[in-house]
Amino acid sequence: MRIIDDIKLDFNDVLIAPKRSQLTSRKEAILTREFKFKHSNHTWAGIPIIASNMDHTGTNAMAHVLMEYHILTALCKFVKSTEWGWNKNIIRTIGLDQNLDNLPYDSDTAPWICLDVANGYTERFNDYVSLMRAHEATKDKIIIAGNVCTPEATEQIILAGADIVKIGIGPGSVCTTRKMTGVGYPQLSATIECADAAHGLGGHIITDGGCTVPGDIAKSFGAGADFVMLGGMLAGHDECAGEVSDD
């Protein structure tokens, strides 16, 4: 076993030191960014925040609201909807068992596709990313793949054909991976290290999980994240599909 003895950080471990600014109001801050991706020919401009593809967060109702603000929604892979035509702010989600010859949606309805698994450290996962980049239905898409939490895995996934790697093993508010398996990595350090690896290859990352307050989103971007994926911070809103529990 190799012991990592250098300090690793989470969101609660740091604060952003203030600096002098030319802005006179927070309203003057420009939140939108424009991206061009490594493998895909697509570009995208908007606010780089993504509603998570969790069961009760990545809903059609959530997408309808967030797209008004040019924010992305990753639809849960169990959401069955034919209401979407071409939409640049919708991300479709699939798993490793998905037959790319028989996608559960019209492949022409969105430029994004997300391969979502709990553990991106398998050969099967990387092979599937390569298959997606070569397959007729997905080869031109903006491919998101994850999750991983180390720079070596980030580089491997980008080289396999992904445009964006999803970063985070176990930081989510309802995720039990760390408790049940002991596997994970402090999310802020994971973001810093994986962003450096991805950007060195012309790729991008999504910080997925661990944000509980708006300041965590700011820290994620400061650490090098290109996109931030939110689940718990959006859960409980009217657009979620979960049942209301009154305690």
Give the positions of each predicted feature.
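Active-site entrance/lid segments in N-terminal catalytic domains of soluble metabolic enzymes
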Residues: 1-204, 232-237, 242
